[in-house]
Amino acid sequence: MAKIIKFNEEARKKLENGVDVLSNTVKVTLGPKGRNVVIEKSYGSPLITNDGVTIAKEIELEDPFENMGAQLIKEVATKANDVAGDGTTTATVLAQAMVKEGLKMITAGSNPVFVKRGIEKATKKAVSILETKSKKIAGNSEIAQVASISAGDEEIGNLIAKAMEKVGENGVITVEEAKSLETTLEVVEGMQFDKGYISSYLVTDPERMTAELDDPYILITDKKISNMKEILPVLEATARSSRPLLIIAEDIEGDVLTTLVVNKLRGTLNVVGVKAPYFGDKRIGALEDIAILTSSQVISKDKGMELEKVDISSLGSAKKVKVTKDNTLIIGGIGKEKDITSRISQIKTQISSTTSEYEKDSLKERLAKLSGGVAVIKVGSATETELKEKKLRIEDALNATKAAIEEGIVSGGGTVLIEILKEMESFELSGEERIGVNIVKKALTAPLKQIAENAGLEGSIVVEKVKNAESGIGFDAAKEEYVDMIKSGIIDPAKVTRSALQNSASVAALVLTTEAIIVDKPKKEESDTPNMPMMM
C-alpha cells in the first residue's frame, strides 16, 4: 500500500495538533471544579465521566497524522492508569505542557536529542525529590481522605476506608452494580490469584473484557491439558448440568483450547480456562488452598490421578467467579468452614517455623488470600448513566487508595509539583540539556494552573502565590483558599504523581525526537455508477 510521509516541523506540528485535541478534552476534568465529558455510545445511554483514561480511549481523529499525536497522549493516560490506576488527567496535562514547550525550543533550533536527555535527567531528579516528600499513610482517616479526593465524594471515601478495614491491605475489593438506589458494602469470603483467561475468546463481557461465571463447577489440575479425550467426560457432564465450568490447569494447549473456544462461541459450553498460579511448591500449595476453599480435589500427576476418570464429584464450586486478562477471583467457595480453618492454622504454623524470608512472605500472601475475603462495593443509582459514572469514580478512588498504601502520600492539588520545582531551582545541566530541564520545570506548574483555571481563576497568579508560600501550603480549589494541604486532607498518592511524571516525560521525549511520520495513503473510493456513453 502507498504511504504518505511528512517531515520535520510539518510532522511535529501535526503531532502537536493531535496532542492538543486530546489533552484539551481531558484536562477540563481536572480538580474539584473540573467538568464532565459526555461520550456517545453506539448502544445504550451516553456515558458521562470525568475519568481521564476513559475519555482518552474514546478519541480517534480523522486526520491520520494528528491521530498519531492523540494516540501517543492516550498511551500516557493508559500507562499511568496501568501503573497507579489514577492520575491519568495529571499525566496528560504534564505531557501536553512538555510537548508544547519542547516543540517551541526545537523550532527555534535546539537539538532534539540533547533536549530529550535534559528532560529525562530532570524527570529523574524530580522523582527522587518526590520520594523524599512521601509520607506513609497513617490510619483509616487518611485512607478515607485519599479516596474522597479521587472520587470527589466523601461518602465514597468513607466506604472504601471501611472496605480496607474489613479485608486488610492484602484483601481484595471489587466494584459491582447494585439493583437498588443505595451504594453499599458487602464482605464475601473469596480468593484472588494473578492469572487471567488463557484466551480472550472465552470472555462473557466483551466490552469490559471479563468472564463472569455464576455457580460454576471448578476443575483443578497441575497437568497440561493437551488431549481432548482427557477432559471430554468432564465437559459432557457439565454440559448436561447446564452450569458453567472453570478449568485451572498448568496449561491448555492446541486442539483442546480450540475446541473450548468453538463450543463457547456456539453457546454449547460456558467454560473459562486459566493457568495455575505460581510455580513449583508454591503452586502446589496454592492449588490445594483453592481446592479446600471450593471443596474440590487437585487432580495431580504426583498422586497418580487421571483426568479421564474424573467425575462431577471431584469438581468444586463457588457462587461466582470473575476472570480478567490478569486475575481470577473466586467468590463464595462451597468449602467447609472447618477445613478452611484447619488450612489457615497449618499455614500459620509453617510461617512461624520457616527461616526463609521469601517463603515467609509467600505463605503470608497465601494466608491473606485464604482468610481475607473479598469486599464488594455495590454501586446504586437512579439512572444507568449516573451508575456508570459513579462506578468509574469508585474504581479510580480504589486504585488511588491502593497506590497510597504502597508508596505513601504527598500534598495534593498539584502542590507537591510546585514544591519539587522550588527544590529544582538550583538543578542545572550544561549545553542544550539545560533546555530539557527548563521544559520539565515549566511543566511542573501546569496541573496546578489547570486546576485553578477549571475553578474560574487566573492559573498563573495561583501558581505564583503557591510558589511564594511556605512548604505544604497549596490552593484548595473547592473553597478557593490557600491551606496546609495535608492537614486539610487534600492529598495525592505518591505513586500516582510519580507515574504521571515518568509517563508524561517518556512520551514527550518521543514526540520531540520525531523527524518523520508515515501513514497509509487512503484508497480512492470507486464510484458504483457505471460510465454512461456520451449522447450524440
Swiss-Prot record:
Its EC number is 5.6.1.7. It catalyses: ATP + H2O + a folded polypeptide = ADP + phosphate + an unfolded polypeptide. The keyword Isomerase applies. SUPFAM superfamilies: GroEL apical domain-like (SSF52029), GroEL equatorial domain-like (SSF48592). Gene3D superfamilies: GroEL, GroEL-like equatorial domain, TCP-1-like chaperonin intermediate domain. It is an enzyme of class 5 (isomerase). Keywords: ATP-binding, Chaperone, Cytoplasm, Isomerase, Nucleotide-binding. Pfam families: Cpn60_TCP1. It is found in: Cytoplasm. One of its GO terms (biological process) is protein refolding. Its main location: cytoplasm. InterPro entries: Chaperonin_Cpn60_CS (IPR018370), Cpn60/GroEL (IPR001844), Cpn60/GroEL/TCP-1 (IPR002423), GroEL-like_apical_dom_sf (IPR027409), GROEL-like_equatorial_sf (IPR027413), TCP-1-like_intermed_sf (IPR027410). The keyword Cytoplasm applies. Disulfide bonds: none annotated. ATP binds at residues 29-32, 86-90, 413, 476-478, 492. GO terms for cellular component: cytoplasm. GO terms for molecular function: ATP binding; ATP-dependent protein folding chaperone; isomerase activity; unfolded protein binding. Signal peptide: none annotated. Together with its co-chaperonin GroES, plays an essential role in assisting protein folding. The GroEL-GroES system forms a nano-cage that allows encapsulation of the non-native substrate proteins and provides a physical environment optimized to promote and accelerate protein folding. Forms a cylinder of 14 subunits composed of two heptameric rings stacked back-to-back. Interacts with the co-chaperonin GroES. Belongs to the chaperonin (HSP60) family. HAMAP family: CH60. This is Chaperonin GroEL.
